[in-house]
């Protein structure tokens, strides 16, 4: 046992040979510790000269560099500080974060991933595509936008332009054509965004969209805030609608922005940095439903849009510009339906395609429409452009007018509301005089009101009394 211990110690004391340096491998003793079949060989690696050792970095070859290369960032700086800060939101100490998207973590919309949801971009030229812009409409809109970007001395310029008029007269589309003509990508809002289940959210959204437009202007590009159908979201449509806190906040926010257009802050975050002035364009059908101080002349410039005969003809030429309809036929079509809105002629053009759709349905069968339209390898069907003659257009126009007259003539809603769900069953009650026609009991004069003592502290208190007759008796 002692001999084995000394042998192991001899092995541990033997010098180790690496790369041919030091003692040779043949000096390793042959002991029983390594076994009888151990093959002993010496390493033959050449020695590396420490004086001539160099590390050379190869220059970057842009041909070999691809977008899929995960190490691309080592050669080029592809980071975005704003996006990196935003990604770190919620991952660092909240002490260094401003609340409500107002601190450094709130990235300025500068890349495609951060384009505002309300930003509308146009890819058309109204001159090339043949769209018609009414001269009066364009003059009003261009002048309002231009003077809001000018520094006019000692002049208070209304920030808001309210364009109102009848339904379907092309107010929104004419605005978009003017924006495209001027090279403006507006920040869009609709009436549906002016109400929310949370109090104050629509007012905050207006301020956010206004500041987004201000950021675009700060970068050197014209922008404006465009709100569609303001009266539908913030107006009062009689007793059938409820006036909520959000309605009040929307009106108050627009009034405040109109008074201080260069100092629009988000709730709870205030700084002294001024933002660029952003013109606001709103559309609606009846601005008398809005809060009166909002539409006063110092805050809102109002423009009533009623297209003339020339405007209607010009717009209709743009509607039928690809259908090879003669100009004389368009004039005849407009004169035949003088009381209709411009939207009527767009619906009239769409009605002409009914024959083509009906023909295609008869060919493929009603039971296979879903497979052909939604889950088809061939894709949706394509139709040849139908020939639009003046006789066909006048015929379909007459059908649309007849449908409008039926709605106004029948008025089933009034019939349902007056007769409730009982229909003719109310006739007997009406004849007997016991049917109040939906009026409350307090509104009918012949309903008796019980009198008596209504004071609970009195000894003769009558809980069924609805009017005090002065007969209360008190015990002292």
UniProtKB/Swiss-Prot annotation:
Lineage: Eukaryota, Viridiplantae, Streptophyta, Embryophyta, Tracheophyta
Database matches in InterPro entries: ATPase_AAA_core, P-loop_NTPase, RCA-like, RuBisCO_activase_AAA_helical
Organelle targeting peptide span: 1-56
UniProt KW Oxidoreductase keyword: no
Tree of life domain: Eukaryota
Keyword ATP-binding: yes
GO cellular component entries: chloroplast stroma; thylakoid
Organism, scientific name: Larrea tridentata
Annotated protein name in UniProt: Ribulose bisphosphate carboxylase/oxygenase activase 1, chloroplastic
GO molecular function terms attached to this record: ATP binding; ATP hydrolysis activity; ribulose-1,5-bisphosphate carboxylase/oxygenase activator activity
Matches recorded under Pfam families: AAA (PF00004), RuBisCO_activase_AAA_helical (PF21228)
Family matches, as PANTHER family: PTHR32429, RIBULOSE BISPHOSPHATE CARBOXYLASE_OXYGENASE ACTIVASE, CHLOROPLASTIC
Keywords, in A-Z order: ATP-binding, Chloroplast, Nucleotide-binding, Plastid, Transit peptide
Record function comment: Activation of RuBisCO (ribulose-1,5-bisphosphate carboxylase/oxygenase; EC 4.1.1.39) involves the ATP-dependent carboxylation of the epsilon-amino group of lysine leading to a carbamate structure.
Cellular localization per UniProt: Plastid, Chloroplast stroma
Family indicated by similarity: Belongs to the RuBisCO activase family.
Binding-site list for ATP: 165-172
